Regions:
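Fe(II)/2-oxoglutarate oxygenase catalytic core
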Residues: 1-135, 141-167
Length: 167
């Protein structure tokens, strides 16, 4: 509920409605310096997942943002990755782990399903992953999408754990 309160407080000022061929959503980016507690939460969740499963080198959070997908505009995000790739770029830090916290109850919306694609296999959310407060982590290079919201609104908080470029 605290995260929803932060979103509500910020939503009146710092929102960006993103409409493109790839996505339709309202995003609110958190100022890292003003919301250290939220960054710390995302980092601790990413660290636990990393220690339990991934074993990547991570040491920071890129930033966090709220995403609101609304039935009014069939809010969605098409297949994409959160990681720019293994190519040489000017960036020293790379996104390595994506962290999604579900902030809506599953009864508040229809559609809006987070799907992950592994090779030719698409993994859909399990019902317990739809509950408000549930956390989903995955490597930032895994292709994923949010299907169109057909009824209601879906709110989530997303953050990315980063580390030095891949070797």
């Amino acid at each position: 509920d605290r995260l929803v309160s932060v979103h509500s407080a910020l939503a009146s000022n710092d929102v960006e409605h993103k409409v493109s061929a790839n996505r339709t959503s309202t995003t609110t980016t958190l100022d890292n310096s003003q919301h250290k507690d939220i960054n710390d939460l995302i980092y601790s969740l990413a660290s636990k997942a990393n220690n339990d499963t991934y074993g990547f080198h991570i040491d920071d959070i890129d930033y966090c943002q709220f995403n609101l997908y609304d039935e009014k505009d069939a809010g969605h995000h098409k297949w994409h990755i959160d990681f720019k790739g293994f190519e040489e770029t000017q960036e020293i830090k790379k996104r390595k782990i994506s962290v999604v916290i579900q902030l809506s109850e599953p009864t508040e919306y229809e559609g809006g399903e987070l799907q992950l694609k592994y090779s030719n296999y698409t993994k859909q959310q399990k019902s317990d992953m739809l509950k408000k407060g549930s956390v989903i982590t995955f490597p930032s290079f895994v292709e994923h999408r949010v299907t169109p919201v057909t009824k209601g609104k879906r709110l989530s908080l997303i953050g990315w754990a980063t580390g030095n470029a891949w070797n």
